[in-house]
């Protein structure tokens, strides 16, 4: 009787091995599920990015508002009869190096 129980236990273990550790086992399925979740998350991020880019393209094609905004912020352009005011942070050091103008020596009289 003991021999039969041991044989049955061994058979159960042999049957369970491919279920858990085999090519199509539960561990592999779990790993693939994690990969699918990561891919879906990345796809959602890319869809959001594409939607944002598509709306920007539509704005540039149809209206002048987006073009005007880009001209203002990226190129520093202003409209006619507009006053440009720039507020600087007093605590932030300027990244520009000021160079004094060159000295001009007076011409000699002849």
UniProtKB/Swiss-Prot annotation:
GO terms for cellular component: cell division site; cell septum; plasma membrane. The chain crosses the membrane at residues 4-21. One of its GO terms (biological process) is FtsZ-dependent cytokinesis. Residues 1-3 are cytoplasmic. It comes from the Bacteria. Residues 22-110 are periplasmic. Residues 31-64 form a coiled coil. It is found in: Cell inner membrane. It is a single-pass type II membrane protein. Keywords: Cell cycle, Cell division, Cell inner membrane, Cell membrane, Coiled coil, Membrane, Transmembrane, Transmembrane helix. InterPro entries: Cell_div_FtsB, FtsL/DivIC. The keyword Glycoprotein does not apply. Its main location: membrane. Part of a complex composed of FtsB, FtsL and FtsQ. Belongs to the FtsB family. Essential cell division protein. May link together the upstream cell division proteins, which are predominantly cytoplasmic, with the downstream cell division proteins, which are predominantly periplasmic. PANTHER family: CELL DIVISION PROTEIN FTSB. This is Cell division protein FtsB. It comes from Herminiimonas arsenicoxydans. The lineage of its organism: Bacteria, Pseudomonadati, Pseudomonadota, Betaproteobacteria, Burkholderiales.
């Amino acid at each position: 009787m003991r021999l039969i129980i041991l044989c049955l236990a061994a058979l159960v273990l042999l049957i369970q091995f491919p279920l858990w550790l085999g090519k199509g086992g539960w561990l592999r399925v779990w790993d693939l599920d994690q990969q699918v979740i990561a891919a879906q998350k990345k796809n959602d991020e890319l869809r959001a990015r594409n939607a944002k880019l598509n709306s920007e393209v539509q704005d540039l094609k149809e209206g002048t508002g987006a073009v005007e905004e880009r001209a203002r912020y990226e190129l520093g352009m202003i409209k006619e009869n507009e006053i440009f005011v720039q507020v600087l942070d007093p605590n932030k050091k300027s990244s520009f190096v000021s160079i004094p103008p060159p000295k001009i020596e007076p011409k000699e009289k002849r």
